[in-house]
């Protein structure tokens, strides 16, 4: 009786009409239908761990927090990849051995800002000794993938272009993206339109820029493609980027870069000496300068010795593919082999990791602007027998994601 009376009191005090309705469901429901659409920060480490964390967690930690570098890793394990993707976004994974895998963001392990994450080998069937070369979020519906192209680059200097729809159907055990020769690795994979250019950088300090249309769209996936840049000796490609296409005459480029150097406070002697027909007396109209400035990409270059610089995309002439390219950094001043080179915005940050397990976060705006063939400035003060081994790009999230603290 006591229990009955207590339950009656609870009913009288808290009873409210049902707000939901129970109906018969005739359709099919997938797990994904129950997943809320939410922006996630996806983090990958050099030790092969991956996780997703709600972006709002980083916003809550903005004041006094450690921001995007807050995850727990071993001393030798550092963040190498970091980007924001929606829970329903398709992620294409490409490995250094030329395989492709596909997962939705929500299928990645969910972890807090300081969580370690889960080993990628427990999520994707990646062989020992193989690592992730690229992770590509694709927000476009799969039915539209046939209208997009994907560009691949290998360490041997080859490049290939395929329809993105070639990777619509990817089994759980993966799909061959590129049949690589022994000793060759996949360097990167990026979506590229016909109004964009491809840039390849080698570890010896060479760079080449050409239109994506210089590479035909391949029908198969096993070919290694065509030559993107001619390599000498033990040289190898270490970075591939896709930037805005822009054609300017040699005089326009010369005049623009002269004004750009003046704005950045560079000395007149710091010009590129590896180009023909450089006219230091060339002029450019204010309208053309504004047009070139609006289309400019800032190219970040980092070396194994910890040196780095920003340079103008207009400093890299558009040429045909297959050549030796131009100097991307002075041989006597670059401070080691080039580790990475890619376009950035001044609001972004980068995270550098060394062979000794040390890491540091650096705001892009603190890196000096230099001419293409000039040497870099010290970005990371490496010790003896220590080298920078990876550079992670941290895109700006409108000032909400983190505070910009260096670790």
Regions found by a protein language model. Name each.
Residues 1-407:
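C-terminal interaction appendages of subunits in large macromolecular complexes
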């Amino acid at each position: 009786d006591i229990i009955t009376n207590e339950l009656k009191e609870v009913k009288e005090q808290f009873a409210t009409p049902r707000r939901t309705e129970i109906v018969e469901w005739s359709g099919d429901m997938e797990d994904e239908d129950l997943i809320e659409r939410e922006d996630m920060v996806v983090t990958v480490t050099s030790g092969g761990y991956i996780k997703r964390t709600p972006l709002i967690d980083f916003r809550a930690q903005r004041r006094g927090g450690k921001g995007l570098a807050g995850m727990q890793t071993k001393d030798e394990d550092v963040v190498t990849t970091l980007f924001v993707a929606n829970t329903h976004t398709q992620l294409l994974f490409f490995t250094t051995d030329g395989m492709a895998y596909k997962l939705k963001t929500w299928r990645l392990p969910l972890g807090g800002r300081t969580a370690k994450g889960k080993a990628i080998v427990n999520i994707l069937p990646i062989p020992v000794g193989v690592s992730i070369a690229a992770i590509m979020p694709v927000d476009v519906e799969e039915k539209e993938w046939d209208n997009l192209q994907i560009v691949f680059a290998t360490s041997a200097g080859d490049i290939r272009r395929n329809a993105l729809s070639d990777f619509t159907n990817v089994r759980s055990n993966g799909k061959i993206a590129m049949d690589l020769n022994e000793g060759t690795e996949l360097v990167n994979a990026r979506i590229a339109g016909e109004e964009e250019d491809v840039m390849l950088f080698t570890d010896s300090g060479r760079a080449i820029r050409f239109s994506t249309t210089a590479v035909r769209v391949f029908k198969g996936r096993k070919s290694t493609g065509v030559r993107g840049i001619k390599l000498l000796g033990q040289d190898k490609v270490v970075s591939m980027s896709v930037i805005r296409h822009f054609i300017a005459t040699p005089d326009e480029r010369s005049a623009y870069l002269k004004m750009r150097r003046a704005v950045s406070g560079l000395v007149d002697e710091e010009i590129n000496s590896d180009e023909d027909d450089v006219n230091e007396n060339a002029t450019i109209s204010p309208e053309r300068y504004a047009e070139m400035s609006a289309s400019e990409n800032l190219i970040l270059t980092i070396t194994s010795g910890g040196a780095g610089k920003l340079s103008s995309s207009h400093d890299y002439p558009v040429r045909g593919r297959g050549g030796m390219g131009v100097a991307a950094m002075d041989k006597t001043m670059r401070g080691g082999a080039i580790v990475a080179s890619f376009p950035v915005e001044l609001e972004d940050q980068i995270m550098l990791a060394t062979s000794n397990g040390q890491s540091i976060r650096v705001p892009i705006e603190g890196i000096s602007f230099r001419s293409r063939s000039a040497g870099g400035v010290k970005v990371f003060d490496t010790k003896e027998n220590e080298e920078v081994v990876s550079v992670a790009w941290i895109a700006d999230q409108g000032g909400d994601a983190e505070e910009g603290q260096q670790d």
